Amino acid sequence: MKGRECARNEASRSWFGACSFASLPDQAVPACSLGSGEIPMAHGTKQKLMKASDIPAFVNEVIEAGCDICAVGHEKYVIGDTDLSRGAYGKMRQRLGRIEEAYGDRDFLKLEIVAYLRSIGRYVDVGADGSE
């Protein structure tokens, strides 16, 4: 595990994509751009939720996809990638989009994912001044 690489990738655009607003009839709701397309995040929709028991499998699939995933401190985690060509990046986004779709929303499990990543040695601790 290369801690420096993980921390460097924190600022890069990762698979999570950028949030924007998608227009739906009579309302605008935030949507996150993923490899599989726009997914509205409206209240009251039936969205698959990841189970805590799925965290190890999720982490393994992300790693097998070729992306570095690690905790940063005790409250965040990042999914980084290596320098990819435009075509390879597009394929990677699609693969990660399929993983996202298979496991569902995991935002509410962020601290559990961080704890798991730390337990398997995939973490970077950041000092008070932002250094490693």
From Swiss-Prot:
Keywords: Plasmid. It comes from the Bacteria. This is Uncharacterized protein y4lK. The lineage of its organism: Bacteria, Pseudomonadati, Pseudomonadota, Alphaproteobacteria, Hyphomicrobiales.
